[in-house]
Regions:
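A contiguous, basic/glycine-rich beta-loop/short-helix subdomain that forms a polymer-engagement track
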Residues: 334-359, 369-376, 505-622, 630-632, ...
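Conserved RecA-like P-loop NTPase helicase motor core
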Residues: 619-630, 681-792
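Conserved helicase motor "Helicase C" RecA-like lobe of SF1/SF2 P-loop NTPases
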Residues: 655-680
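Signature of the SF2 helicase/ATPase Hel1-core->accessory helical subdomain module
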Residues: 231, 237, 258, 339-358, ...
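Metal-dependent nuclease catalytic cores that hydrolyze phosphodiester bonds in DNA/RNA
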Residues: 1-78, 108
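Conserved pre-motif I regulatory segment
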Residues: 173-220
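A substrate-engagement module of RecA-like helicase motors
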Residues: 178, 185, 243-359, 367, ...
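Mg2+/Mn2+-dependent nuclease catalytic core
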Residues: 57-154
Length: 827
């Protein structure tokens, strides 16, 4: 029987943790502050103190061989010659309330390390010391207990005996899973064209010899071939051969998680003996069963019954779920179990994930530096990553590593705090003044065009943007300064220093006044400050600082221009990663931006008959900003020609809501007999579903939907058959020119001379190709794609078209378009 690998912390916390979930403010970032203070204490301990000592030992309980391993915070020999295991804990608990028996898990960790080290070194006795560091006062409290090795071994053996049934359950499951997955058959009678090739690529990547940074694969496969099954099936087969312990299926949006759930359900339906556990992780805000009056999770034991006593009941819930045989733990199943056992569904999903084979969730569970799953990704593991809709990852990753902070947050906090003097009020005023001076500096460097409106600061004084008044602080050299926006390559330390100084008094106030009326506002401020300070610690040559003056406000953004090193580090936590999408063109762009320049990239051709796709372009129309007014009527006429060619459902995609609205108003005025539907901004899940329901099969009347490229209907929407028979794409999808996009352009110009491509052309064309992919979803589908922009005829754009667009026809005018559409539909 193979040894059961068991981290010390997992063993101890699983068996001994008790009590409630309590998310009240504790005054420090546990992950970052705890690690920093550990290093501080370890360094202060001197040369004879061995820090972060890796320990591993073999033990047996209930016939199960265990490998127990972990890192002891410190090991040293005291003046009496006794070996001491030091367990360091950072706490916000007041020093007077820190007790020796405050948390049994703390002693247990030290005792297990003592057992491992004592046997390894042949010791007869040793001490365990708990070192508590109080983060507010810097007080250090130490407690020491004396043990014989026999006592420590007995303690460890007792823990293992308690854990043995869980280990036996998991070992039996892994054996059953291995047999099941190694014999897993493809769940359809035959592969669709392209599916076998894609599955083969993914299988080879997952089963390749492990490397330090993991194997990377980029797969571009046409919409409609069944990509989800084509990547899931081979990855599961790889796990069946022993290549990979868990599979993480990562998506850009919740709506695409259902595709993975459905694929796994199909596998279960085709194989009644399939041994597979899958869990879908959903944001806490969406699954909370007991939100507060404002609809937010209230994770406090006195407010939420699902948080109160959570750790006393969660293992009972886990046992019931793992033994029920279904293996499918989606949002609904977790909610049902949470209600049955009175446990938090969000935390239950996280705890259940350690016992599951497939984990489905958002990108941020792997890539976000704040919310990634530390239980899996703080160190490398035998994980397989499937990254769906990978064309979305560059922008999502940039957002994850960026941060913003506004002067108005300081103003609102001061207002919430009210009158009176305090250390916090002084720190707030200093930070507010620094941002006021920063706003003056920005307005001086980059006055807004035509701005003459007087701006009032918090003291009631007024100044004019761009006035000659000399700011009291100096910003770093500007790389860009125009119309109220300044970009700097260096960090604006003069703004960050007062925010850093604000942290301690803000923490003290939040801890001292948890019931104050201003607590919520100041807690929001605290998190905003921490977010920008964390980003400043990551800040390097891949970032730029953006300062924007708007009225009396100043916005500071630390923008991640190039997320490649951070994405690379995240992917390195696993054995293999397959990043796939219908649109990864050009592949070199995505490999570079996502930190995988040497990765294998494959592009599969469309298996669908070319004659089923009518593909036309009207290059006589220019949608450039300066020609937009002139383009509105020709676009309306072209859309009318498309929608009148055959009764059915159509979509027209635009680069912006404003442009969409202009054309829609003109279209409905001139073609009132054609039914229309407009995508509104900010649609929730219900609004999205209602929009799509209008695209019914076998329509008796024509419906033309107006949507936005890159939005919720421009990708990830499956309207097969006659639910959608045509789409028009207005423009080449270029992002709006902005200071941010210009900084991206400059950055990549300096990197490789392709700044316009990286910042504008390639992201824009990705939106175009995604929108066009809504039309043909199956072998039987037939439909039309109409491109409206003269740039589609330029080689820089045309070379980005997929190979199955070879038959694209460029037409002179709407009259010729009507003729071609009639021929296509045979009417």
């Amino acid at each position: 029987m193979p040894a059961f690998r068991l981290p010390v912390r997992q063993l101890v916390e699983f068996l001994l943790r008790t009590g409630s979930i309590d998310s009240r403010f504790t005054g420090f970032d546990r992950a970052n502050e705890g690690a920093r203070i550990h290093r501080k204490l370890q360094k202060a301990a001197g040369e004879g103190y061995a820090a972060e000592v890796f320990l591993s030992g073999e033990r047996e309980a209930a016939g199960i061989p265990f490998t127990i391993e972990g890192r002891a915070d410190g090991i040293f020999t005291d003046e009496a010659g006794v070996t001491v295991i030091d367990e360091i804990k950072t706490t916000a608990v007041p020093a007077d309330d820190i007790a020796e028996d405050m948390n049994p898990c703390h002693w247990a960790q030290g005792m297990v390390y003592g057992a491992l080290y004592g046997r390894q070194q042949g010791l007869e006795k040793l001490d365990v010391r708990l070192t508590y560091y109080q983060i507010d006062t810097d007080d250090i409290l130490r407690f020491v207990r004396h043990f014989t090795l026999e006592e420590l071994e007995a303690f460890l053996q007792d823990l293992l005996e308690q854990y043995a049934p869980w280990a036996q359950r998991q070992l039996a499951w892994k054996e059953q899973r291995g047999v099941s997955l190694s014999a897993l058959d493809f769940p359809f009678p035959a592969y669709r064209p392209g599916q076998r090739a894609l599955a083969g690529e993914v299988y080879r990547a997952c089963t390749a010899a492990p490397s330090k940074s993991g194997v990377r694969l980029f797969c571009q496969a046409p919409t409609g071939i069944g990509k989800t099954m084509s990547v899931l099936f081979p990855a599961l087969r790889a796990i069946g051969t022993g290549c990979g312990e868990k599979l993480f299926y990562l998506t850009a949006r919740n709506t695409t998680q259902s595709a993975a759930e459905d694929a796994i359900a199909r596998l279960r339906a085709s194989d009644s003996k399939l041994a597979l556990r899958s869990v879908t992780l959903t944001a806490k805000e969406k699954v909370c069963l007991h939100p507060d009056a404002e609809g937010h999770p209230a994770c406090l034991p006195e407010l939420c019954p699902y948080a109160n006593g959570y750790y006393d009941r969660v293992n009972t819930a886990l046992k019931a779920l793992l033994d029920d045989g279904t293996g499918r733990f989606d949002r609904a199943a977790l909610a049902d179990a949470a209600k049955q056992f009175t446990v938090c569904p969000f935390e239950l999903g996280l705890d259940l994930s350690e016992w599951c084979d497939v984990i489905i969730g958002d990108y941020n569970y792997l890539f976000d530096p704040v919310v990634h799953l530390r239980r899996f990704f703080d160190s490398a593991g035998d994980w397989l990553f499937l990254v769906d809709e990978a064309h979305n990852l560059p922008e999502r990753a940039r957002a994850m590593y960026s941060a913003r902070f506004c002067k108005s947050s300081l103003t609102e906090a001061k207002r919430a705090l009210g009158r009176g003097k305090s250390t916090l009020k002084t720190a707030l005023s200093k930070a507010d003044k620094a941002f006021l001076e920063g706003r003056k500096a920005v307005s001086t460097l980059a006055p807004r065009r035509g701005s003459t409106v007087a701006e009032e600061d918090d003291s009631g004084q007024t100044s004019l943007p761009g006035s000659a008044e000399t700011p009291a602080i100096e910003l770093p050299a500007a790389d860009y300064a125009q119309d109220g926006t300044v970009f700097c390559k260096e960090l604006p330390s003069a703004l960050l220093a007062p925010l850093r100084a604000l942290t301690a008094p803000l923490q003290d106030w939040l801890e001292a006044d948890p019931d104050a009326e201003a607590h919520a506002a100041l807690l929001d401020l605290y998190f905003e400050v921490q977010d920008i300070l964390r980003a400043s610690e990551r800040y390097d040559e891949h970032f730029a600082a953006q300062l924007t003056a708007r009225g009396s406000d100043l916005e500071l953004q630390l923008l991640c221009l190039d997320p490649s090193p951070f994405v690379d580090a995240s992917l390195s936590a696993g054995r293999a990663a397959a990043l796939f999408s219908a649109t990864l063109t050009p592949p070199g762009y995505y490999r570079t931006v996502l930190g995988c320049p040497e990765a294998r990239a494959v592009a599969l051709e469309s298996p669908f008959p070319a004659e089923n796709l009518g593909l036309y372009c009207l290059p006589s129309i220019s949608t450039r900003y300066r020609q937009r007014d002139a383009s509105i009527r020709p676009i309306s006429d072209a859309l009318a020609a498309l929608a009148s060619s055959r009764v059915g459902n159509y979509l027209a995609f635009f680069p912006s809501y404003a442009y969409l609205r202009q054309v829609w108003e003109d279209f409905t005025a001139h073609y009132p007999d054609i039914g229309t539907l407009v995508q509104e901004s900010g649609l929730d899940d219900a609004g999205r579903a209602a929009f799509l329901e209008r695209f019914s099969p076998c329509p008796e009347k024509t419906l033309l939907g107006f949507g936005v490229m890159g939005g919720i209907f421009g990708e990830g929407v499956d309207l097969a058959g006659d639910r959608l028979i045509g789409c028009a794409i207005v423009g080449v999808g270029l992002p709006q020119v902005s200071p941010r996009q210009e900084m991206l352009r400059r950055y990549y110009d300096a990197q490789n001379g392709a700044g316009f491509d990286y910042a504008y052309r390639w992201p824009g064309m990705n939106k175009v190709l995604q929108a066009a992919g809504r039309v043909i979803r199956t072998q039987e589908d037939k439909g039309v794609v109409l491109l409206l922009d003269d740039r589609f005829a330029q080689s820089e754009y045309a070379r980005l078209f997929p190979k199955h667009w070879r038959h694209l026809e460029y037409l002179r005018d709407t009259k010729e378009l009507k003729k071609k559409l009639a021929e296509f539909w045979g009417e």
